[in-house]
Amino acid sequence: GSEMCIRDSTTTLLTRELRQEVEKIFVGNEEYGNFIITVLSFGFKYGIPSDADLVFDVRFLPNPYYEQALRPLTGNDRSIQEYVMKNGDGRRFLDKLEDLMQFLIPRYLDEGKNSLVIGIGCTGGKHRSVTITNGLYARLKKLPYTVRMEHRDIEKDARTKGK
């Protein structure tokens, strides 16, 4: 059918919206089951995700890109996580972000929102944003909501200019 021809930037948006609708049907028994939080890492050089409700810039954290041995790795690797989190700012940022989310989420629920997309961005979307996205996901999944994680730009080659 014609729906198979969709090949633009809306594809991931449509996929996520479809997944959220399906999850509402199957997870709807839980009290907050139909409120879906997506924590999304991305690279600013590839554009801010159009469906992000909140966007946080983590380019202030130590950048492993400049360490030759670390460059090919991602924020899913322990050595990258240790590098990004080494000076304590990453943990403090996660503490503040978790506190902010615990304040905001009940208020978004009161407004009738059924999903929240939190974008975490660094330059390329491979190291710092992935590390912080993983950290925020680990904290938010303890809350009584459906929480999803997505790393949009993790596979993009750091040497590639543009998309």
Show where each model-derived region lies.
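N-terminal start-of-chain detector that recognizes signal peptides
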Residues: 9-12, 25-31, 90-93
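Extended, charged alpha/beta regions that create polyanion-binding interfaces
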Residues: 19-42
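Phosphate-binding beta-loop-alpha motif at adenosine-nucleotide cofactor sites
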Residues: 7-17, 120
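Conserved GTPase G-domain signal focused on the G5
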Residues: 13-22, 46-48
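Short, small-residue-biased leader/transition segments that mark boundaries at the very start
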Residues: 1-6
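P-loop NTP-binding site
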Residues: 34-163
